[in-house]
């Protein structure tokens, strides 16, 4: 059973991009969507750019997540690059591709953009620090190599730090046991066997759908119900996609103008304005459409008004309970009384998840009232002493989401502190792109960006263009480094907290609030005000870099420390929440100092 990325350290060479003491303009960590996009765009600027990738091929999460049933929950063509060369001769077989088709897509991207020539595979970054005397990042890998770069880009996403609870005796389990994100390439055979799935997040739902029809007996261990929504997957033809390609540029432009970076947006109506019959009809239409339209294209007050939220939950629970046969299972998977607000945790998309529990061979284990405490050689031990004997275990236990991915790189500040130390009480970034004390470090699809509230590729391209433009300005203005001030970072954080505290998110432990990692700060880790507002705010920081300490090539320091763009949220906040963010900021500032 793999636990850490460093176990995959196995560089594919010792010369060229694999050489020790590598000198580059830009070093990127991660060769998924983020890293590939940044590499392509920065090479166009004439910058010597190299990517360090822990895995053995392109694709990021889709190289590691090859568990049974693994499939993206964003629809194409939105879940792909807007780069014309990449979509001109590419078509998909379905609106929700599986990991195999996504791997084929990345192979196609490499073919047309020649990506792999600048990607060093099997290269696991374990230490990085900015040398102020050279104005260069010094980056070290697990196998002992060092690289030097003016710009360092963390493109490791939100799920590169896996989470496996420290259950007693887990190392003694005799059968196959794998985390979904460290799944082996070979098939894990469960036919005729006793199998267990621990966790019912996105990957747990998908493995349940795959193993339910195959396993001799399947036990699914549940702590909290997942408000899963029908995916409504359908087959796509090449002809229908090719007919749409002339308007792809407009679609890619539109996705940056919606709240979640998809092609739909919230209804401007309140759930309380419609009659019961009108609400039911509206919910039914959203439900039949499938996908995240059910939550992200719903009434505007669903996540703000408890009554509106309960209306949506009741509709979902009624639909879901009707698909289940057993009353106990109904009460665990879709309780009459909601255990948390709808949308408080990220819903998953499913095809026949609930129907699996109508099989005689599939059993739902309540791991909340009777938690897992450890493993024996042959099974899973519960708090009351019960042992569930199984042959195969799938750990769908998730990630140290968002913040864990950057901390996992071992980055250290110019003050000598580690990012883990700096973020031990609360994460702070500026613009969801930079961190105070870490000059010339950029991160994307990570902490304090729209990340978990958005379509991934939309966020990546919006942030990626900003990073490219920031670097272009630095080169044009002969700037050696930029470092966001603590004041600017704190102002950005207070803005996010103001949104957090006016919403339902702090009412439950969730991925949005940092996950369930022991000792991790309980805080909103993504920017919640939507894609258009985010894009406008970060653009306000160019080309003059408000909120940054700027060091020129001659050593002159220019302190433009007043944060830019934060007041852009005022009108939006008042329209959405009925109160200005300033009062929330003042209250929070009193708490923080």
Swiss-Prot record:
Sites annotated Transition state stabilizer: 346
Keywords for the protein's UniProt record, in alphabetical order: FAD, Flavoprotein, Monooxygenase, NADP, Oxidoreductase
Induction: Expression is positively regulated by the acurin A cluster-specific transcription regulator acrR.
Co-factor binding details: Binds 1 FAD per subunit.
MF (Gene Ontology): flavin adenine dinucleotide binding; N,N-dimethylaniline monooxygenase activity; NADP binding
Function: FAD-binding monooxygenase; part of the cluster that mediates the biosynthesis of acurin A, a highly reduced polyketide coupled to a serine via a peptide bond. The activities of the highly reducing polyketide synthase acrA and the nonribosomal peptide synthetase acrB are collectively responsible for the synthesis of the acurin A core structure with a heptaketide backbone produced by acrA covalently fused to a L-serine by acrB. After the formation of the PK-NRP hybrid product, it is detached from acrB by reductive release to set up the formation of the lactam ring by aldol condensation.
Family: Belongs to the FAD-binding monooxygenase family.
PANTHER family given in the database record: L-ORNITHINE N(5)-MONOOXYGENASE-RELATED (PTHR43098:SF3)
Protein name: FAD-binding monooxygenase acrE
Species for this entry: Aspergillus aculeatus (strain ATCC 16872 / CBS 172.66 / WB 5094)
Gene: acrE
